[in-house]
Amino acid sequence: MIFAQEKLVDQGQGKWTVTIDGEQWIEFLKKAKNRLKANLVVPGFRKGKAPESETAKYLTPIKLYNEAFKIVIKPAFDFALTQENRIQNDNSPTPVIVKVSEKEIVIDFVFDLVLEVKIGEYKNISTIKKSTVEVSQEDVDNVIDMYRSRFAMQKEKEVSDQIQKGDIVTFDFKGYVDDQAFEGGEAKDFVLEIGSNQFVPGFEDSMIGLKVGENQEINVKFPEEYIPSLAGKDAKFVLNIKNIKEKILPAKDDELVKDLNLPDITTYVQLEEKVKKDVLEQKTKNNKSEFVENIIDEIIKTSEFQIPKTIVERQLKDVKKEFEDQLTQQKITLEKYKEITKISQEEIDEELKNDAIHRIKSFLVVSEIKNKENIKASEEAINTKFEEFANLYGIEVEKIKSLIDNQAIKHQVESELLETFIFENNGN
């Protein structure tokens, strides 16, 4: 027997190839022939007793080769297992006949490769720079305005009043391109907050200054990245503005703070300080996560991976499910998505597969770093995390422990430790 092997890395598979020829193959063919003859029933003869001249009519080469294949599989597989430095397999190999004749048989044993990573450098990577985080007054005002919106009042404007940014407008509209109404361009009693950017760029800005009344026109241009039938085209919308309401926000003062009833916050100055602190923490967290993701991408570039095809298929199934759920949530059909994005089904499939593979590679990289650096969550860190959740939800620690699995907390703590390790050991 002759042994050869090959890694099909792109497919996440490997194969052992065993060739049996010469006298050895002839012996297996003889065994196959004798086994077939012993069970062959030829009219006019007892089972297995027909002469060679008669059995030859029934024992075709295909039948003979198939029977010999059944006999030779085990010794061929056992021979492959004796080979030193053979590629390790992750599941039971599937035998496939590559070539067969009266002179030889060539069998491939195809299997999944063992999932593994040979990680590249994961410390002192300087190609990704750390950025500083700042909190502007606008950032603070935006958060406080969301608080104020909880207690906002609406006051109907006079018929003679103009629309201003922030107003709530009820109106009918109908859109035209080249003087032809288009699908999806019409609605009745639509309610819109001016400045919320629900419509295409320019639509809401064009409404500013209008008053209650019928047959008012505005002109917009659809973005280039839009439904192909409308992308980049000029459009006219005829509006019937029925009602304009002013959104009245409460003042930025201690009364607002009293209404919010936040723990340990009694003045507006304290509220601003808390918001600034919270925004800074969130921005810092997001900045850190983005930096770490970019570093992981750099590590992936210099690492070698061996990923079984079955694992890719399993991950791809999850990715496709997420994609389908997102479309459902956005109330968009797959066909409409392809029309909007101008990409084909083949491109979508390729993108989803690449996403699945990237997720697997990211998992392998972080798992390897975690193992190499012995990153583990201590009992103290786990208990501290439980206390954080208890404080967040305002319930007892023991109650939190009964609601959240200990392993889930352990995983979260270790993920945070790992993220901190990567952040502190890379970039400038």
Swiss-Prot record:
GO MF assignments: peptidyl-prolyl cis-trans isomerase activity
Record field: catalytic activity: [protein]-peptidylproline (omega=180) = [protein]-peptidylproline (omega=0)
Annotated SUPFAM superfamilies: FKBP-like, Triger factor/SurA peptide-binding domain-like, Trigger factor ribosome-binding domain
InterPro entries linked: PPIase_dom_sf, PPIase_FKBP_dom, Trig_fac, Trigger_fac_C, Trigger_fac_C_sf, Trigger_fac_ribosome-bd_bac, Trigger_fac_ribosome-bd_sf, Trigger_fact/SurA_dom_sf
Enzyme class: isomerase
EC number: 5.2.1.8
Alphabetical keyword list: Cell cycle, Cell division, Chaperone, Cytoplasm, Isomerase, Rotamase
Top-rank taxon: Bacteria
A GO BP entry: protein transport
Domain PPIase FKBP-type: 166-250
GO CC terms, sorted: cytoplasm
Endpoints of the signal sequence: none
UniProt-annotated location(s): Cytoplasm
Role summary: Involved in protein export. Acts as a chaperone by maintaining the newly synthesized protein in an open conformation. Functions as a peptidyl-prolyl cis-trans isomerase.
NCBIfam families: tig
Comment on protein domains: Consists of 3 domains; the N-terminus binds the ribosome, the middle domain has PPIase activity, while the C-terminus has intrinsic chaperone activity on its own.
Family of this protein: Belongs to the FKBP-type PPIase family. Tig subfamily.
Record-given protein name: Trigger factor
Gene behind the chain: tig
